Curated annotation (Swiss-Prot):
Catalytic activity as recorded in UniProt: a (3R)-hydroxyacyl-[ACP] = a (2E)-enoyl-[ACP] + H2O
InterPro entries found in the cross-reference section: FabA_FabZ, FabZ, HotDog_dom_sf
EC number of this enzyme: 4.2.1.59
GO cellular component annotations of the record: cytoplasm; membrane
Catalytic-site annotation from UniProt: H54
Compartments where located: Cytoplasm
Gene3D superfamilies xref list: Hotdog Thioesterase
Name of protein: 3-hydroxyacyl-[acyl-carrier-protein] dehydratase FabZ
Source organism per UniProt: Shewanella loihica (strain ATCC BAA-1088 / PV-4)
Entry keyword annotation includes Lipid metabolism: yes
Family note: Belongs to the thioester dehydratase family. FabZ subfamily.
Broadest EC class assigned to this enzyme: lyase
Keyword terms: Cytoplasm, Lipid A biosynthesis, Lipid biosynthesis, Lipid metabolism, Lyase
Length: 153
């Protein structure tokens, strides 16, 4: 494998993920190796719409959105593994999750780091492990599955 650093800025992320505000939860990819790993970040600010109701007095990022961001990172790794070009003909859908565990809260001002690893891919189903961390401290871990599906037109 090459030692070349592979990154993605928000413009490239938007080419691969169908998500848009307020549901796009990946800001940048710091490094990836197709078929192996991807390291992405989400900058969590007080301006996130979910903080209005979760919780106004003590804002905490909902765990389900941490998992969704992790799933978006797996989708990026899947796209980069299967094809280097974005496709308008197929998407990777969040297909399953196992062994999700939460270890600490995520608050405004935190920077979430996602490390996802591809375990296997078979017949369009990818299996990944993922961890989310803040300041090197584990926030969440999970096993995630995503499925490649053609878009009906």
């Amino acid at each position: 494998m090459s030692n070349q650093l592979n990154t993605m800025d928000i413009k490239e992320i938007l080419k691969f993920l169908p998500h848009r505000y307020p549901f796009l939860l990946i800001d940048r990819v710091l490094d990836f190796t197709p078929g192996e790993t991807l390291h992405a970040i989400k900058n969590v600010t007080i301006n996130e719409p979910f903080f209005q109701g979760h919780f106004p007095v003590a804002p905490v990022m909902p765990g389900v959105l941490i998992l969704e961001a992790m799933a978006q990172a797996t989708g990026l790794l899947a796209f980069k593994t299967m094809s280097d070009e974005p496709s308008n003909d197929a998407l990777y859908y969040f297909a399953g999750i196992d062994n999700a565990r939460f270890k600490r809260v995520v608050e405004p001002g935190d920077q979430l780091h996602f490390e996802v690893k591809m375990i296997k891919e078979r017949r369009g189903i990818g299996v990944f492990t993922g961890e989310a961390k803040v300041d090197g401290e584990l926030v969440c871990s999970a096993e995630i599955m995503c499925a490649r599906r053609e878009i009906a037109k």
